[in-house]
């Protein structure tokens, strides 16, 4: 390939400011000299018109005869602007908050949602922000909207609800790459709210309720099974030890007397309880082992 033929990216970059910087011609120097002479003649009145104050968080892009002076922004502090030939534009370098209004999005699983967000960005190159784009803030705002719709359109509803941070980071990376030539650096992207249709909300709530009920039934069944195992073990211990049964009997009487002190309890003798059961502990011991 001929080395004189440049790639599309190279040609694209050459259209931006800062690549082809030409000095002032003869006419430019003549106009510059006349403007400077005018300042000297009208001194000290002209000095108040030529001196401009640039704040700490601002930069001034000075155009001299239509060309950016010194190929960089000036400030902070005092700058000199010559009359008739110099024009300057102030650029705020502080972080800007860009609220993205609710965007109607069709997800990958064919669910219509409304998603809004916020983008935090700042200008790091005042020259690029002024010379490479007409309205840098409006361009960033529109690009943030389209990027949000494009990225969320490739995700399912469950992925959007569960992976907000990953999606926001992906949007931030795409925006940062796209706005680099505009002198913009995207600091952070946040997805504020995801609105889904009311009917879908009801179906999701019913599904979640059914899942919770099924989980509760499983836990209750496991608890009853564990309790039945414990009761079985306790009954076997009490059957093997009549003294333990008597102690349990006395403990129950003490508990009833403490909790319900207005109730009079007449304890039955153990031999009567054994008679009601149909067999005494002594007879139980005398029964032959069927095994």
Swiss-Prot record:
Which residue intervals are topologically Cytoplasmic?
50-291
What InterPro entries does this protein map onto?
Band-7_stomatin-like, Band_7, Band_7/SPFH_dom_sf, Band_7/stomatin-like_CS, Stomatin_HflK_fam
Q: Which residues form the signal peptide?
A: none
Q: Which Pfam families would you find in this protein's record?
A: Band_7
Main localisation: membrane
State a GO cellular component annotated for this protein.
membrane raft
Q: How does it assemble?
A: Homodimer. Interacts with PIEZO1 and PIEZO2.
Family of this protein: Belongs to the band 7/mec-2 family.
Protein name, UniProt field: Stomatin-like protein 3
